[in-house]
């Protein structure tokens, strides 16, 4: 049916069903205002606002407007897809600005808001600016129409202010770069930081654009983010609830007054005191079991209140830690509704899926609890949904728990991102770990100097020492076979009642579990844990393990991969850990005699598996870690006094990391790209590969401060290898089977399918293509 309506010629959005439309002026001003209000740096608001005004100017083209008119009259089927909306805005900006670097920055943001791209093409050397300058568009018409909507003189004045804003931004980068160059710690380069600035401004534009567009089609007023005043009120309420919660916990704790709780309180108080300081980069280095989750949260709440931060973002390396600590955070602050838990295993109640989807896209929540994978994707992925929420990291407090688990290949990217957020965007970062990586300077891209939030780590080492770590790697020449390890574990379980075995591969863990089932008495309780189990299976298994450990009525063995190594709150009498990094060994030791409940030292054995039992040929990081640990073990054997007679000393940890980093290949910490002879650090910096191609194409050097290959880098960036991207749903229990039955029904609506698939995530396992082929018809 045809709509009979009056057609305007400056349309930005149209809705056939209702006959409503939004003009270009309405949309561009909404986006400009929303993005500027969201921007946490007041000095950048004018520049961000200007970008909002120009971002969709291309929609004024005659072909675009004809498209909109047809949609209004005949419906969505009349729409011609793929018309360029961004090129005209960038070219108009370049015409208005005399300063090339400023116009290039703004136009690049506009060009990229419909999809990431490379500023210089790695294959043909063409720059993004050249590509858009050569593009055939309805430019003269668009320009004429635009200046009928906007006053040119007013925009010129805005441009002058934006130039000043840009120069201040560039000046900050140059000052930091110069100071970094003359110091012993080179902490980044201007190209990389300029690229991150661009990404955050792009984030603000995308968020504003998507938000206004969604509000138009939903026919609701433009939504507002939580205001600073509302956030301050929330922090006050959280602090009051937190202190009441901790007081009750202390009163109800039967071990109240013991030496561990005294030191936990001291650490918590030091974190509280640090909250009043202006420092923006901290390390919290305390032993496992010292309460760093709640201590760092206490710091964050008080610091957020004092420095008017918008968000507290808690990051954990694994879902197992995240789920456990998210629940602890919710209890402690007494306001579960302000905690956004963002990871793949979250299942929403009926009716709340859309709100959760929106929150995970924007992170518009006071407290966000998420994984290292999610935050690293937010910083470096090419996906627009990741870019959209990046600005949320600004003017926030970010707590990285178990920071040593950040992959080695991401190390320099991580360092530079932390430097950028803390030095330029008012963010405070806390790096938490019992085994902090060394801060000894590397050649370049170091993290800035950190302050220890709770003083020197060795102060608490003796108080929290609950285990003796014993080197048993030489018990079997050539390493233990599965049978040797199983007998060893059985013997230790007879002696210690409960044993946790942590191995480096899922195959070795499963084979050991099967062998133990064959040789252990029936009264033994045997458990197995690995990422080959679906999340619900892991949760149920952990619950059973904790129950038996608490009852202390049976001998128990748990054989696991490193999925239980950090953050899982249970305690065994003995731990057997296959040789890995010293950080892994110490984290594993944190699952032994956790609360000093044994009345003696717990025992942790480091064992060496044979090459046949534990195949590590494809696990380079583990082999590197083993080699670094081997040097520490040899030094300890020759002179244990240099490590204060314990393998978990600060001296041993420092020696381990120095060994580890010294043996890495060139560029291994810069995120090497297999198909390119370059790294992501390079692509997001000077992009020498692209610049060389530009010279070949144009016969001269490129004159730009934005040579980055954002798209190539973003597509290559993945924290976890693509090897495990095949998802398999396991019919683990009745609920899983019922959901699978529903999903197989014919004519199921798309929305219902999405709900079922979301609920099935707790029953889903990631496997490799190779394993999928091996399983064949079994899946």
Feature annotation, model-predicted:
Residues 335-380:
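Inter-Walker segment of RecA-like/P-loop motor cores
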Residues 309-332:
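Conserved Walker A/P-loop ATP-binding site and its immediately adjacent core
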Residues 387-396, 404-460:
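Post-DEXD/H (motif II) to motif III coupling segment of the RecA-like Helicase ATP-binding lobe
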Residues 435-492:
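Interdomain hinge/linker at the junction between the two RecA-like core domains of SF2 helicases
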Residues 102, 106, 422, 483-496, ...:
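C-terminal helicase lobe and adjacent C-terminal extensions/tails of nucleic-acid helicase motors
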Residues 278-300:
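Walker A/P-loop
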Residues 2-18, 24-240:
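Accessory nucleic-acid engagement/destabilization modules that flank
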Residues 14-16, 340-353, 504-507, 526-542, ...:
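Conserved helicase motor
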